[in-house]
From Swiss-Prot:
Provenance organism: Pseudomonas putida (strain ATCC 47054 / DSM 6125 / CFBP 8728 / NCIMB 11950 / KT2440)
Biological processes annotated in GO: methylation
Role played: O-methyltransferase that catalyzes the 2 O-methylation steps in the ubiquinone biosynthetic pathway.
Protein known as: Ubiquinone biosynthesis O-methyltransferase
Superkingdom, natural source: Bacteria
Gene: ubiG
Length: 232
C-alpha cells in the first residue's frame, strides 16, 4: 500500500502555479526558508554535500541548499509542483535533480547515498509518517544527518496554525492542515529513534503577527524542526 494521500497531493497540485509567488499562499514558506536553511547549514555545512529533499514541492528549499553548494535531489509525489520546480530552475539557473517518487521507493533504489536528508513540512501530509522517517534513515549515509520539521499537536497549535493562519490571518488556504495529523515532538523523537536516528537538536519557529516576522527560538509549541544523526 502506497504511503501517499491523494487528497493532500491534490491540495498542492491546485496551488502549484503560485509556488514561487512570494505574495501567494506560499509566502510563509519563502519567509521561513532562509531561517531554516541557515540552521541546517550551521549544523552540516551544505557545501559539497550530497543532499536529498523529501517532499520538495516547488523547490524552494532544494534551490536554496543548491545555492549553498550542495548537490541536491528533490523528490515529491505532486506532478504539478515538480513541473513548477523544473521550470523555475531553468529561470534561476540553479541545478537540482527532481524526481516523482516516494521516499520508500527511493530508499530501495538508493540506500546510504546521501550526506544529508531534509524532510520539512511533509510528515503531516502522509498517512504513515514513521514509514517516511524509516526511509530517510535508509537513504542517509552512516554518520549523515536527517532534518525533519512539522507542527506540534496541542490546543495552541490548533489556534495558531489552523484558526489563526487559515481563518483569521488567511495566510494559508482553509483546509491546508488537518489537526489530527499534527505530530508532537515526543512522537517524532520516538519514531526517529525507532528508525535508528539519534535526536541531536530541536528548534521552534514562531510568528509575530504584529511585526509579521518569523524567528527561531526554544518555543516548540507550534512549528518546530529537529536534527537527527545516523550513527556510524
Amino acid at each position: 500500500m502506497s504511503n501517499v494521500d491523494r487528497a493532500e497531493i491534490a491540495k498542492f497540485e491546485a496551488l502549484a502555479h503560485r509556488w514561487w509567488d512570494r505574495e501567494s499562499e506560499f509566502k510563509p514558506l519563502h519567509e521561513i526558508n532562509p531561517l531554516r536553511v541557515n540552521w541546517i547549514d550551521e549544523r552540516v555545512s551544505l557545501a559539497g554535500k550530497k543532499v536529498l529533499d523529501v517532499g520538495c514541492g516547488g523547490g524552494i528549499l532544494s534551490e536554496a541548499m543548491a545555492l549553498r553548494g550542495a548537490t541536491v535531489t528533490g523528490i515529491d509525489m505532486g506532478e504539478a509542483p515538480l513541473a513548477v520546480a523544473q521550470l523555475h530552475q531553468l529561470e534561476s539557473g540553479v541545478q537540482v535533480e527532481y524526481r516523482q517518487i516516494t521516499a520508500e521507493a527511493l530508499a530501495e533504489e538508493m540506500p546510504e547515498q546521501f550526506d544529508v536528508v531534509t524532510c520539512l513540512e511533509m510528515l503531516e501530509h502522509v498517512p504513515d509518517p514513521s514509514s517516511v522517517i524509516r526511509a530517510c534513515y535508509r537513504m542517509v549515509k552512516p554518520g549523515g544527518q536527517v532534518f525533519f520539521s512539522t507542527i506540534n499537536r496541542n490546543p495552541k497549535a490548533y489556534l495558531l496554525a489552523i484558526v489563526g493562519a487559515e481563518y483569521i490571518l488567511k495566510m494559508l488556504p482553509r483546509g491546508t492542515h488537518d489537526f489530527k495529523k499534527f505530530i508532537r515532538p515526543s512522537e517524532l523523537g520516538a519514531w526517529s529513534r525507532d528508525a535508528g536516528l539519534q535526536v541531536k537538536d530541536i528548534i521552534g519557529l514562531t510568528y509575530n503577527p504584529l511585526t509579521k516576522h518569523y524567528k527561531l527560538n526554544s518555543d516548540v509549541d507550534v512549528n518546530y524542526m529537529i536534527q537527527t544523526l545516523r550513527e556510524e
